[in-house]
């Protein structure tokens, strides 16, 4: 609701940019309920394999239930900082809307490159600060409204305050790279 549905378009473009071939392997970290995994499977005509890493067991269970018909997805309850997977296993590593929530970003990145095959691709989709002054002003005003909208729609503004604060405190694109 808060992104006005644009986050779905970003996820689809993310997979398009990834451009996975058939029979490729993806590890999707901070998978949530598996949106990226589902899009990856669709893009590879269900020939690609996906391992979803999700630290929240309730979220993982929702994803398993939602995508139970897709047999090419394996679910693992683990954190981004300690992935119980062998080295050099995946063609792609994805993390969408999750890297700003990890406990230790250096450990997360080390794990990412450990599980990627040589030549594998690290893919990160994340909210970040806006550098364009005109858009920045619009975004800042919208950010003030998001918790109010959240409180009106779901009766709780705290998750939306956290979202805005975590985006503001996180690295910008250049700092992350």
Specify the residue positions occupied by each region the protein language model found.
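A short SAM/SAH-binding and catalytic strip from SAM-dependent methyltransferases
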Residues: 91-105
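Class I SAM-dependent methyltransferase SAM/SAH-binding core
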Residues: 25-82
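C-terminal alpha-helical "lid/dimerization" subdomain adjacent to the S-adenosyl-L-methionine
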Residues: 53, 129-177
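A short glycine-rich, Lys/Arg-flanked "PGG" loop and its adjoining helix->strand segment in the class I
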Residues: 106-121
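Short beta->alpha hinge that forms the Motif I/post-I loop of the SAM-binding pocket
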Residues: 54-55, 104, 127
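A short acidic, Gly/Pro-enriched loop at the edge of an enzyme's catalytic core
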Residues: 81-93
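Conserved alpha-helix/loop element of class I SAM-dependent methyltransferases that forms part
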Residues: 4-24, 39
């Amino acid at each position: 609701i808060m992104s006005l549905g644009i986050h779905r378009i970003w996820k689809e473009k993310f997979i398009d940019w990834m451009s996975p071939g058939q029979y490729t392997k993806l590890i999707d970290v901070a998978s949530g309920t598996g949106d990226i995994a589902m899009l990856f499977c669709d893009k590879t005509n269900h020939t690609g394999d996906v391992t979803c890493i999700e630290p929240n067991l309730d979220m993982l269970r929702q994803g398993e239930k939602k995508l139970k018909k897709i047999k090419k997805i394996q679910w693992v309850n683990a954190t981004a900082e300690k992935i119980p997977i062998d080295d050099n296993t995946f063609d792609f590593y994805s993390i969408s809307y999750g890297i700003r929530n990890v406990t230790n970003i250096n450990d997360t990145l080390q794990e990412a490159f450990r599980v990627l095959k040589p030549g594998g691709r690290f893919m990160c989709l994340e909210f970040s600060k806006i550098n364009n002054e005109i858009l920045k002003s619009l975004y800042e005003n919208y950010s003030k409204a998001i918790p109010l909208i959240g409180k009106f729609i779901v009766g709780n503004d705290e998750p939306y305050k956290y979202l805005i604060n975590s985006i503001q405190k996180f690295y910008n694109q250049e700092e992350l790279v």
